[in-house]
Amino acid sequence: MAAAAAAGPEMVRGQVFDVGPRYTNLSYIGEGAYGMVCSAYDNLNKVRVAIKKISPFEHQTYCQRTLREIKILLRFRHENIIGINDIIRAPTIEQMKDVYIVQDLMETDLYKLLKTQHLSNDHICYFLYQILRGLKYIHSANVLHRDLKPSNLLLNTTCDLKICDFGLARVADPDHDHTGFLTEYVATRWYRAPEIMLNSKGYTKSIDIWSVGCILAEMLSNRPIFPGKHYLDQLNHILGILGSPSQEDLNCIINLKARNYLLSLPHKNKVPWNRLFPNADSKALDLLDKMLTFNPHKRIEVEQALAHPYLEQYYDPSDEPIAEAPFKFDMELDDLPKEKLKELIFEETARFQPGYRS
């Protein structure tokens, strides 16, 4: 062990990866939003793992996302949600420039898979079931993921699926309009529910269901269903398929400017799903219709989606666990300076330090 440690940190593509002596034989996988991901050999458990290097401390937003992700993933425990196996960082806060998060190694993700393969109905059904099974747990903890998209769904060779990237996640709070909530909302536009763009009051779990609907549509056709180039284009893509919203649906849009914009548009008819996806299973299209519903109050919820006939071969409520307790952030992270967030990240990762006692 001492000899390995003395060899110093490994370099990957010009970046220091200081994870020895336990983790060796590093191999580049890709770049994350603010760090590199490598696979490595875990000499303790004798398996290959994924290690994400994060260097967030220069930016308040990156610190926030890192802390959210670590806090949530250390409390969640579910087969369809990526866990954290280990966290490596410097022994003192002054020395801590990077954080290394060790997770199970998953060979690919749904984004990469859909670029190269057309999925069978069986695969679509099984992947969708696992997404919803993981989402049931997330929502039972009163958390919104808020950034569900194909690249955040990790897959391995046995078709196990795990949801990752909780950096944008929030505690669900339907009564509270987060100040600045929209401004920092940077989730990928193509998977955003219409109410996010229309500034409806309070976001609910239904925003994640919309994203899952977009993902299902993409699995059926290997292309994004609403590939908007910008904010208004995104809305036009959605209305071009769903048709013009009814008066009842317009009433849930609080923002008058947004409502008037919708009223000013020429009337559009809904495009039948079987015209868009002529080869798709009719039950899959029925579930898709219930997920991609303009009005968030009429959108299907995760438990109902799991019980839908399309998923009946997998549906088993006794094997679809929920969180033991609702998740809470001790404080609103938005307003904290990066120095305070760094302290909180240091504390949150202490349990992985050698000789730690709680």
UniProtKB/Swiss-Prot annotation:
<dbReference type="GO" id="GO:0008284">
    <property type="term" value="P:positive regulation of cell population proliferation"/>
</dbReference>
<dbReference type="GO" id="GO:0045727">
    <property type="term" value="P:positive regulation of translation"/>
</dbReference>
<feature type="modified residue" description="Phosphoserine; by SGK1">
    <location>
        <position position="27"/>
    </location>
</feature>
<dbReference type="GO" id="GO:0048538">
    <property type="term" value="P:thymus development"/>
</dbReference>
<feature type="domain" description="Protein kinase">
    <location>
        <begin position="23"/>
        <end position="311"/>
    </location>
</feature>
<comment type="function">
    <text>Acts as a transcriptional repressor. Binds to a [GC]AAA[GC] consensus sequence. Repress the expression of interferon gamma-induced genes. Seems to bind to the promoter of CCL5, DMP1, IFIH1, IFITM1, IRF7, IRF9, LAMP3, OAS1, OAS2, OAS3 and STAT1. Transcriptional activity is independent of kinase activity.</text>
</comment>
<dbReference type="GO" id="GO:0018105">
    <property type="term" value="P:peptidyl-serine phosphorylation"/>
</dbReference>
<dbReference type="GO" id="GO:0014044">
    <property type="term" value="P:Schwann cell development"/>
</dbReference>
<dbReference type="InterPro" id="IPR000719">
    <property type="entry name" value="Prot_kinase_dom"/>
</dbReference>
<dbReference type="InterPro" id="IPR017441">
    <property type="entry name" value="Protein_kinase_ATP_BS"/>
</dbReference>
<dbReference type="GO" id="GO:0016301">
    <property type="term" value="F:kinase activity"/>
</dbReference>
<dbReference type="GO" id="GO:0060291">
    <property type="term" value="P:long-term synaptic potentiation"/>
</dbReference>
<dbReference type="InterPro" id="IPR003527">
    <property type="entry name" value="MAP_kinase_CS"/>
</dbReference>
<dbReference type="GO" id="GO:0005794">
    <property type="term" value="C:Golgi apparatus"/>
</dbReference>
<dbReference type="GO" id="GO:0008286">
    <property type="term" value="P:insulin receptor signaling pathway"/>
</dbReference>
<dbReference type="GO" id="GO:0005856">
    <property type="term" value="C:cytoskeleton"/>
</dbReference>
<dbReference type="GO" id="GO:0030278">
    <property type="term" value="P:regulation of ossification"/>
</dbReference>
<dbReference type="GO" id="GO:0032206">
    <property type="term" value="P:positive regulation of telomere maintenance"/>
</dbReference>
<feature type="short sequence motif" description="TXY">
    <location>
        <begin position="183"/>
        <end position="185"/>
    </location>
</feature>
<keyword id="KW-0547">Nucleotide-binding</keyword>
<dbReference type="GO" id="GO:0005524">
    <property type="term" value="F:ATP binding"/>
</dbReference>
<dbReference type="GO" id="GO:0030878">
    <property type="term" value="P:thyroid gland development"/>
</dbReference>
<dbReference type="GO" id="GO:0005739">
    <property type="term" value="C:mitochondrion"/>
</dbReference>
<dbReference type="GO" id="GO:0014069">
    <property type="term" value="C:postsynaptic density"/>
</dbReference>
<dbReference type="GO" id="GO:0032355">
    <property type="term" value="P:response to estradiol"/>
</dbReference>
<keyword id="KW-0965">Cell junction</keyword>
<feature type="modified residue" description="Phosphoserine">
    <location>
        <position position="282"/>
    </location>
</feature>
<dbReference type="GO" id="GO:0004672">
    <property type="term" value="F:protein kinase activity"/>
</dbReference>
<dbReference type="GO" id="GO:0051493">
    <property type="term" value="P:regulation of cytoskeleton organization"/>
</dbReference>
<dbReference type="GO" id="GO:0042802">
    <property type="term" value="F:identical protein binding"/>
</dbReference>
<comment type="subunit">
    <text>Binds both upstream activators and downstream substrates in multimolecular complexes. Interacts with ADAM15, ARHGEF2, DAPK1 (via death domain), HSF4, IER3, IPO7, MKNK2, MORG1, NISCH, PEA15, SGK1, and isoform 1 of NEK2. Interacts (via phosphorylated form) with TPR (via C-terminal region and phosphorylated form); the interaction requires dimerization of MAPK1/ERK2 and increases following EGF stimulation. Interacts with MAP2K1. Interacts with DUSP6. Interacts with ARRB2.</text>
</comment>
<dbReference type="GO" id="GO:0006468">
    <property type="term" value="P:protein phosphorylation"/>
</dbReference>
<dbReference type="GO" id="GO:0005769">
    <property type="term" value="C:early endosome"/>
</dbReference>
<dbReference type="GO" id="GO:0071364">
    <property type="term" value="P:cellular response to epidermal growth factor stimulus"/>
</dbReference>
<dbReference type="GO" id="GO:0032991">
    <property type="term" value="C:protein-containing complex"/>
</dbReference>
<dbReference type="GO" id="GO:0031647">
    <property type="term" value="P:regulation of protein stability"/>
</dbReference>
<feature type="binding site">
    <location>
        <position position="52"/>
    </location>
    <ligand>
        <name>ATP</name>
    </ligand>
</feature>
<dbReference type="GO" id="GO:0045893">
    <property type="term" value="P:positive regulation of DNA-templated transcription"/>
</dbReference>
<dbReference type="InterPro" id="IPR011009">
    <property type="entry name" value="Kinase-like_dom_sf"/>
</dbReference>
<keyword id="KW-0007">Acetylation</keyword>
<dbReference type="GO" id="GO:0000165">
    <property type="term" value="P:MAPK cascade"/>
</dbReference>
<dbReference type="GO" id="GO:0015966">
    <property type="term" value="P:diadenosine tetraphosphate biosynthetic process"/>
</dbReference>
